Each structure stands twice: as structure tokens, then as C-alpha cells.
Regions:
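Internal catalytic-core helix/loop-beta-alpha segment
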Residues: 107-122
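Structural scaffold elements adjacent to functional motifs in cytosolic proteins
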Residues: 129-131
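Rhodanese-like catalytic fold shared by cysteine-dependent sulfurtransferases
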Residues: 2-110, 134-171, 180-306
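Substrate-contacting helices/loops that form the catalytic groove of nucleic-acid
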Residues: 177
């Protein structure tokens, strides 16, 4: 049966997150759904996978509940194993901003739809896209002319301000995967004196679905085993914009350095994986440390890698 992945969020005041967590876990288990759901007093943020029928039942159940009506669900084709298990947790925030203390229900940027943004590109309107994703996410796909956040974690958002000061009186559009981070990121810019701040409604995924290979190049990074999602990738207009860290050839295949104390997330082509092990290592030192490590000895006790 065809699998489907749902990406969704909602900022809404939840009085008893633990109760909602338990309800979410029970609902997902009853529908054989796997994925990650975060519940907090500020709302819910989730990505789940199941059959098309079961994910649609999940949406129906959410609409009938107390808190989660009128959520915009971003749907994409699953592979049946996007997630190894179900994780439903209560956390202080659904997107960790820590000390920034931004409440999107009180302050956030104006919404711009995928259609409006596409029109702006076509009409060559003056505007500036700021990609609020982590730095490793946009190396596989990005909007034309975008300004990178340059951050490794969303809670480092303050580091974005110095590179954007010249845009305080310009039209700025914040973008992210599904929209949840831009709710806070756009609000953060507003409270810091930016005068014309927008956020891409429903995120990059929705734009790519409606306008594949038009002003967004490459593939979209996602936080599950698929790692990247593309739309109409057989179209001659589709570009592979990622580059192998080692040889700089076009690639959009993400790997982790195999060494336990590194695990750097990066892009590598198949030709540049270690010939002896088939794994990715950042450098000779990482491989040597991995060979000596206890984890390697437990996993491959009979092999002596040089």
C-alpha cells in the first residue's frame, strides 16, 4: 500500500501537554503511524508516516479534537520506512529558540503564499529571501538569490542579524521547510526593527509541489530517512545543486561520518565513499579513530581495517 508522510504544526496554547502527548501516542499507535511529534504549551509539531488511508484518518481525528482544527498538512510520498519508530514527546518549545522568547501568536511576519511568491519572481519585484534553515539543509536545494542564515541550529538565530542589517527597510521573505521555524524567525526580525517581513506560508515544500523546478533549485532536505525530497526530478529543468564534499561533483546524497565522535552530516557521492568499508569519513584521522574505536570492534569484531 502507498505510504504518505504528513508534515504539520500549529501554534496554540495547550494547558496540559502531557495529556495531549498521551492522546497523540494512542491515536498514532491505533493507526500504525510512525514518526516524531513534539507537544509543548505553545503547540504541536509533527512528521508522521503511514498508509494514505491511515494518515487521512489521523487528519480527521485531529480536526475533531480540541486544539488542532484547521491545520495545513504538507503531504508527500513516503517509502514505508521514513521513521524507525514512533516518538511523541513533551518539550518546552515545538521549535527550540531558547532565550529569544518569540510567541508567533502575538508577533510574526506577514504570510505570502506560494502563488504570490512565484508572481514576485516572475515580475522581478525587489525582495530578499532569507533561508532560516540550518546550514547543512540548503546545500541540497535553495531559492534563487537566497541569503543563507549561516546557522547550525535554530536557537542561534541571533547570529543572523549582522548579515541582514542592510535589509531593515527592504522586503524580506523568510523561508523554511514547512513553515514552523519561520513563524518565530519572521517574528524575531519584526521585533528587531525590520519593517516589511513576510514568511512563506506552508513552507518550501508547498512551493515546490506547486512550482517544481521554478526558482527553487535542487531538492528539499527533510528530517527522516528519505533525507531529500524532489518534485518532477525527471524534468530537464531540474538541477542537482549539491556538491560532494570531497570531489565537488554534483550530488544530493547525505551521509554521516562513520566515526562516533564526529558524525558530521554532509554530502558525498558514491565514488568518494571509503573503498575499504563503503562508509564516509571526513578525513584520514576520522577513519583511523573509527578503526581503533570500541564501537567498530563490536560491530566488526573479525575485520582488521587498515
Amino acid at each position: 500500500m502507498q505510504s504518505q508522510v504528513l508534515l504539520y504544526y500549529k501554534y496554540v496554547a495547550i494547558s496540559d501537554p502531557e495529556k495531549v502527548r498521551n492522546e497523540q501516542r494512542a491515536l498514532c499507535e491505533s493507526l500504525n503511524l510512525k514518526g516524531r511529534i513534539i507537544v509543548a504549551k505553545e503547540g504541536i509539531n509533527g512528521t508522521i508516516e503511514g498508509t494514505v488511508a491511515d494518515t487521512e484518518k489521523y487528519i480527521t481525528a485531529m480536526e475533531e479534537g480540541q486544539y488542532f482544527k484547521n491545520i495545513s498538512y504538507k503531504k508527500s510520498e513516503g517509502n514505508g520506512h521514513a521513521f524507525p519508530k514512533l516518538s511523541v514527546r513533551v518539550r518546552p518549545e515545538i521549535v527550540t529558540a531558547k532565550k529569544l522568547d518569540i510567541d508567533p501568536t502575538k508577533v510574526t511576519g506577514k504570510y505570502i503564499s506560494a502563488e504570490q511568491l512565484h508572481d514576485w519572481f516572475v515580475s522581478k519585484k525587489e525582495f530578499y529571501i532569507v533561508d532560516m534553515r540550518n546550514d547543512y539543509e540548503y546545500i541540497s536545494g535553495y531559492f534563487e538569490g537566497f541569503i543563507p542564515s549561516g546557522i547550525q541550529n535554530f536557537y542561534d538565530l541571533e547570529q543572523v542579524l549582522p548579515r541582514l542589517q542592510h535589509l531593515k527597510d527592504k522586503t524580506v521573505v523568510t523561508v523554511c521547510t514547512g513553515g514552523v521555524r519561520c513563524e518565530k524567525a519572521s517574528g524575531f526580525l519584526v521585533v528587531n526593527g525590520f519593517n516589511d517581513v513576510y514568511q512563506l506560508k506552508d513552507g518550501i515544500q508547498t512551493y515546490m509541489e506547486q512550482y517544481p523546478n521554478e526558482h527553487f533549485k535542487g531538492k528539499l532536505y527533510v528530517f527522516d530517512s528519505r533525507l531529500t525530497v524532489g518534485f518532477n526530478t525527471d524534468d530537464p529543468k531540474h538541477e542537482v545543486v549539491g556538491r560532494c564534499d570531497y570531489c565537488q561533483k554534483p550530488s544530493d546524497t547525505y551521509v554521516n561520518c562513520e566515526y562516533n565522535f564526529c558524525h558530521r552530516h554532509h554530502i558525498a557521492c558514491e565514488d568518494c565513499l571509503d573503498a575499504e568499508t563503503g562508509f564516509a569519513f571526513c578525513n584520514k584521522e576520522c577513519k583511523e579513530n573509527w578503526v581503533k574505536s570500541d564501537s567498530r570492534k563490536k560491530k566488526y569484531p573479525q575485520q582488521n581495517f587498515i
